[in-house]
Amino acid sequence: MCLVEVKPGPPKPQASCALPATDGQEIRTDSEMVKTAREGVMEFLLINHPLDCPICDQGGECDLQDQSVAYGRGATRYEENKRAVTEKYMGPLIKTVMTRCIHCTRCVRFSEEIAGVDEIGALYRGEDMQITTYLEQAAEHELSANVIDLCPVGALTSRPYAFEARPWELKKTLSIDVSDAVGSNIRLDSRGREVMRALPRINDDVNEEWISDKTRYQVDGLSKRRLDKVFMRKRGKLQPASWDEAFKAIAKAKPGNSIAAIAGDMVDCETMFAAKTLLKACGSSLIEGRQTGMDYDVSNLAAVNFNSTFAGIETADAILIVGSHIRWEAPLVNVRIRKAVKRGARVFVVGPQWDTTYPAEFLGEDLGGLLLHLAEVLVHLLRRSRHPDVVDALLRF
């Protein structure tokens, strides 16, 4: 679709994405030659593509659908048999209809280059090429469902969201992910009072264009298998009950000061008042507020100005990870660290072993061993490195 007509130049369309700019060029993007060439490219893309738009979950937000409307022919000239392949299993999150695949290899390149996990690859060559996982096992890494957003057709779609709704039926609400401390920018799509799905929003300073699988699929907990009513065990079985019955049963089973409440420093006043009223009704006065130490100090701007940004992690030349399984606790920070390693950064980890997606030196968790090696690492980080970074366990929420 990037073909253009260039004058002066060869008498055939040129790929503008690979064409160097020179003085005096005349670029035509809507000439008859360009239209004919784009129609030919689109016709080749659609040769083996099934006419599944009415039943495809990608319908309404499909790149191939949009490009076909904009640049394609009104009718096909292909009368031969179309290619068909067997379905591939990629796990409980990714639904596959690989007959729709156009072999763009976006999913393969994402898994290898961004996630750093070689789980998705290509078999065979040419028209016979097929995209699949290793031995048709599930794609299990923490960013696997991003291939759903990358797929320009309906070959890879969301299995939990299959046949649930169409894009034009949904209300879009901009939001922030709270499943970890990264604060990824997301968009929540809802129909009525039900949240149907969560999708990433582009923010190059935070999550770029990715989200973790936990962020994407935690919305299921809002409507499925949710404890939205009181249950009491009667005769060995859980049965629905009212709140009054539940509170009376609690007060009877644990009267007086055998019941206590502990509230954190993030609880609002209304909730604290309700908790105090509940304990008073149960005959208890044991209520306490615990300070977690997670409050943010705003008295000194140095705590903000001297810290690295998420994007700044990519420019670090030495990184020390302290007590954090960063790949699972903050997958998008792990992506940034992987980029830094590609640029030559060294990574040191204080804590137990875990499977990284880049070379890292584990210093262990034994205090004796740390006393021997930690000083050397700190010297390397603070003296020899120009842009050191320290990532600690506070990335957990």
Residue ranges and their predicted role:
Residues 3-177, 182-186, 192-194:
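Fe-S ferredoxin-like electron-transfer domains
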Residues 1-2, 212:
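Short, thiol/selenol-centered motifs that function as redox-active sites or metal-ligating centers
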Residues 1, 12, 22, 36-37, ...:
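Generic alpha-helix structural propensity
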Residues 46, 50, 97, 104, ...:
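Catalytic alpha/large subunits of respiratory electron-transfer oxidoreductases
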